[in-house]
């Protein structure tokens, strides 16, 4: 499913080992080569301990849910220098938000203010672009599909067409995710218990 990247910041990290929240995300680390989130920098909680890494690689996330990212334990956290690819991207100081969006003819479309991400692959799916002031009266915000992107540098994103007029749809909202393991943080469904209780009450009344 698609989620706004901004919703993944200050997002809880839940540990199966501890049974609750142990830290939170501070920012997403995006690889400009393939436009995907490869890791999240963490802040607060258990990562305040200098002996514990402060980055979470996306491959170590067991599940994404409304309550947060679920991991096995803090043992999966790493330091930047421990992962060559992560260290290399951090040195680029790349930030997708704030980049100008222009056409091949250098016509300015706007500025990236957010983006949507596939929660399964963490690939960037769409750019949310704020239009310039004079154009925002008609199109205050546009979304650009990644297929329209032809080039990215430190300052701008170049797209194939003048604009891709696609508004954010319901697909960018949270959808139910079916995990491949039992989620200990998910609230149990007591519907079955309520039904059993109702049957029991009716049986008692009948016997009386």
Per-region residue spans from a language model:
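Peripheral interaction segments used for macromolecular assembly
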Residues: 1-208
């Amino acid at each position: 499913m698609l989620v706004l990247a901004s919703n993944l910041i200050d997002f809880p990290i839940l540990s199966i080992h501890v049974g609750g929240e142990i830290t939170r995300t501070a920012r997403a680390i995006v690889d400009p080569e393939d436009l995907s989130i490869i890791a999240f920098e963490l802040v607060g909680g258990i990562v305040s301990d200098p002996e514990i890494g402060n980055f979470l690689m996306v491959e170590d996330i067991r599940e994404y849910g409304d309550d947060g990212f679920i991991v096995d334990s803090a043992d999966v956290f790493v330091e930047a220098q421990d992962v060559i690819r992560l260290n290399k991207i951090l040195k680029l100081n790349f930030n997708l938000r704030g980049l100008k969006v222009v056409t091949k003819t250098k016509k300015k479309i706007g500025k990236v203010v957010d983006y949507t991400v596939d929660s399964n692959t963490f690939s960037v799916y769409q750019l949310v672009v704020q239009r310039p002031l004079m154009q925002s009266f008609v199109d205050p915000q546009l979304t650009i599909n990644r297929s329209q992107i032809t080039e990215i540098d430190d300052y701008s994103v170049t797209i194939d067409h003048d604009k891709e007029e696609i508004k954010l749809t319901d697909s960018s909202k949270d959808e139910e995710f079916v995990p491949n393991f039992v989620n200990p943080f998910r609230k149990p469904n007591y519907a079955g218990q309520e039904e059993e209780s109702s049957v029991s009450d009716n049986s008692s009344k009948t016997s009386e």
